[in-house]
A protein has these predicted regions:
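Inter-motif core of Ras-like GTPase G domains
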Residues: 284-308
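Conserved beta-strand segments of alpha/beta enzyme cores
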Residues: 106, 267-269, 353
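A glycine-rich (often HGG/GG-containing) alpha/beta subdomain
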Residues: 1-144, 148, 152, 328
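Generic enzyme active-site microenvironment
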Residues: 270, 304, 330
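Switch I (G2) and immediately adjacent beta-strands of P-loop GTPase domains
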Residues: 50-63, 67-71, 252-279, 297-300
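Generic preference for hydrophobic
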Residues: 67, 107, 221-223, 246, ...
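C-terminal-of-GTPase-core extension/linker across diverse P-loop GTPases
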Residues: 2-8, 12, 52, 140-262, ...
């Protein structure tokens, strides 16, 4: 990390300002070459802002700027950092960056600033991953959870469990290495009890992973039904935009339409599908097959029925194809009067909630959000104090740790020797260390930071 790096940290495009970040042991020296104000930045106090101009090597003014000086170690990277706020716009910010690079800085790689924060011990790996989750957050709940992770909520819970296991492993190793010494041995009951407590804590975190993934990525929700029941109208109503064509002609939607929406804080990836029915039309038939695949791929299925019509064989076929999925059954067109078959559908719906709505007027759609929140326990997540696992890498590591600790408890119960039991305890320690970065490989670290944008 001897190189001093620089990059534009704000999104490229037209805006009020752009920020160019410089980090490294030559940050102040390089900034002094390009920044001209009342005082040299190398003589400034930490965390101070200075007015001046950026000039290129020929002494030509590039822009009027504000420069913020932050001295190590109290910076994001724990290195000397200078952030230069320029006028927004692609041309100006790129010209300022080019001037800084020519003065001796190196162009930062994707995620290199955050990687330096990790390597310099300011944040652990799970906190580094939270940075990109904050940037990519699509709703308030996921943003709040990512911020909590950045502040160390998940790291703290992982560290608490891992520290107990490290202590346990150390005590066991002493007993194994010096069996004849008169040492204060840890009992087998202590090993079992602590291991089981740690396993339960790991499992508690693991249980949040499925809901956590939804917070991060959204619920893939397929809207299905026979033609002309109001699927496209529902998509348009929820998206608050005319995303799908709506006509009285059956079979208008022939391909899949996807739309990301935020439904009262719930992230949904809505998939409007072609009407499911038997057809001889080649193009429509392809659309129907895609609809069936959408049902298989969906996290949640919304089955649309036409409450103004009779319940026919095509409706029953859709209900049969979705009975094993997380689903909500919507009886549409309630604005035309009460459906005559609502009670019959509820009787055969099993655990699937049934709701009368009007995609045209919006009646009942507020209750749809409540149902989805209940199905995925999103209300409990929002109200909970514990960390939420949103990253599949973390989920995999927690699952490995849980399995190892389960083997510890089961091994003790059948009289397994301590040196064998200790192997699984160390496996659990390593798995938990993968989350925070203590035991992770360089390849994984590089892969994680490669997913970042340049400038972060």
């Amino acid at each position: 990390m001897e190189r001093t790096i620089a990059a534009i940290s704000t999104a490229l495009g037209v805006g009020g300002i752009a920020v160019i970040r410089i980090s490294g042991n030559r940050a102040l020296e390089i900034a002094d070459k390009v920044f001209f104000g009342k005082d040299k930045l190398s003589e400034a106090q930490t965390h101070t802002v200075h007015y001046g101009f950026i000039k290129n090597a020929d002494g030509v003014k590039v822009d009027e700027v504000l420069a913020t000086v932050m001295l190590a170690p109290k910076t994001f990277t724990r290195e000397d950092v200078v952030e230069i706020s320029t006028h927004g716009g692609v041309t100006t910010s790129k010209e300022v960056l080019d001037t800084i690079i020519k003065a001796g800085a190196y162009m930062a790689m994707p995620g290199e600033f955050t990687k330096r924060a990790f390597l310099n011990g300011r944040i652990d790996l799970s906190q580094a991953e939270a940075v990109i989750d904050i940037i990519n957050a699509k709703n308030e709940l996921s943003q709040r959870n990512a911020l909590s992770q950045l502040e160390g909520a998940l790291s703290g819970e992982i560290a608490e469990v891992r520290d107990k296991l490290v202590y346990l492993a150390a005590q066991m190793q002493v007993t194994i290495d010096y069996p004849d010494e008169d040492l204060e041995d840890i009992t087998i009951d202590d090993i079992r009890r602590i291991s089981d407590e740690c396993r339960k804590k790991v499992d508690t975190l693991l249980k949040t992973a499925d809901s956590g993934k939804i917070l991060r990525d959204g619920i893939k929700t397929a809207i299905v039904g026979k033609p002309n029941v109001g699927k496209s109208s529902l998509l348009n109503s929820l998206a608050r935009a005319e995303r799908a064509i709506v006509t009285d002609i059956a079979g208008t939607t022939r391909d899949i339409i996807e739309e990301y929406i935020n439904l009262n804080g719930i992230p949904l990836i809505l998939v409007d599908t072609a009407g499911i029915r038997k057809t001889e039309d080649v193009v429509e038939k392809i659309g129907v097959e895609k609809s069936k695949r959408s049902i298989e791929d969906a996290d949640l299925v919304i089955v649309m029925l036409d409450g103004s019509d009779i319940l026919d064989d095509e409706d029953r076929e859709v209900l049969a194809q979705t009975h094993n999925k997380n689903r909500i059954i919507l009886i549409n067109k309630s604005d035309l009067g009460e459906s005559k078959y609502t009670a019959a559908v509820k009787a055969k719906a099993g655990k699937s909630p049934v709701l009368e709505v009007s995609a045209k007027t919006g009646i009942g759609l507020d209750k749809l959000a409540e149902l989805i929140r209940d199905i995925y326990s999103l209300g409990e997540l929002a109200a909970g104090d514990s960390a939420i696992v949103t990253n599949m890498r973390h989920k995999s590591a927690l699952a490995d740790a849980s399995e190892a600790l389960t083997r510890v408890v089961e091994g003790i119960d059948i009289g397994m020797p301590s040196d064998i039991v200790s192997i699984d305890i160390n496996m659990a320690i390593n798995s938990l260390g993968e989350i925070t970065g203590e035991t992770v490989s360089d390849d994984i670290v590089n892969k994680i930071f490669h997913e970042f944008c340049v400038g972060k």
